[in-house]
């Protein structure tokens, strides 16, 4: 269940990058 939060963090970073574009 440690991979779940890790994926969310990665997704959040990608979302932030897309929002900046």
Swiss-Prot record:
Family to which this protein belongs: Belongs to the tachykinin family.
Function, as annotated: Tachykinins are active peptides which excite neurons, evoke behavioral responses, and contract (directly or indirectly) many smooth muscles. Is a potent vasoconstrictor and secretagogue that plays a regulatory role in the central control of ventilation, in particular, the heart rate variability (HRV).
Secreted is among the record's keywords: yes
Residue ranges, annotated region (Disordered): 1-21
Protein name: Neuropeptide gamma
Transmembrane segments: none
Localization: Secreted
Any one Gene Ontology cellular component term annotated for this protein: extracellular region
Modification type Methionine amide: residues: 21
Main location: secreted
Keywords, alphabetical: Amidation, Neuropeptide, Neurotransmitter, Secreted
């Amino acid at each position: 269940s440690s991979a779940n939060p890790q994926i969310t963090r990665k997704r959040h970073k990608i979302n932030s990058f897309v929002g900046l574009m």
